[in-house]
């Protein structure tokens, strides 16, 4: 298992901080080479740290509508009847590498989401960005003048 996950830089400006963190959690639950995941929404809810499966489902469909993931539903027949199984294929075109260690950092989900979005706007393979704070806020879809103190 690799210690990094590919996150498409196309999320910048399209997702909120919390949605970005969910996208990262989904990437953590995906195969590190194919970026395909078979995680159940209940399990993803537990990993994300909320109790609202409906919120997770809503965000997953938003990701799909933005072309960030594709969702494939298939019917599974088992001992207890029929149920749906979803698989998620994450887009990795124009990606950045995000360490798996970020998940365990003792910081808020919002700050983790911000750091992921910030990395999406860095120069290839670096932690350097040439944007001003206001321009960066525009690019990421955040309020101008947003600082880490507010997160």
Kindly give the residue locations of the regions a language model identified.
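Conserved small/polar residues in nucleotide/adenosyl-binding loops
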Residues: 149-151
């Amino acid at each position: 298992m690799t210690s990094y996950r590919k996150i498409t830089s196309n999320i910048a400006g399209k997702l909120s901080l919390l949605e970005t963190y969910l996208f990262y959690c989904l990437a953590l639950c995906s195969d590190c080479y194919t970026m395909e995941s078979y995680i159940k929404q209940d399990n993803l809810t537990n990993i994300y740290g909320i109790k609202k499966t409906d919120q997770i489902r809503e965000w997953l469909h938003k990701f799909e509508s933005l072309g960030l993931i594709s969702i494939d539903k298939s019917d599974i027949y088992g001992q207890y009847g029929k149920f749906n199984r979803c698989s998620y294929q994450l887009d990795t075109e124009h990606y950045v590498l995000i360490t798996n260690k970020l998940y365990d950092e003792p910081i808020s989900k919002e700050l983790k989401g911000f750091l992921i979005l910030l990395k999406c706007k860095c120069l290839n393979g670096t932690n350097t960005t040439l944007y001003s704070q206001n321009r960066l806020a525009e690019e990421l879809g955040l309020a101008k003048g947003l600082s880490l103190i507010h997160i």
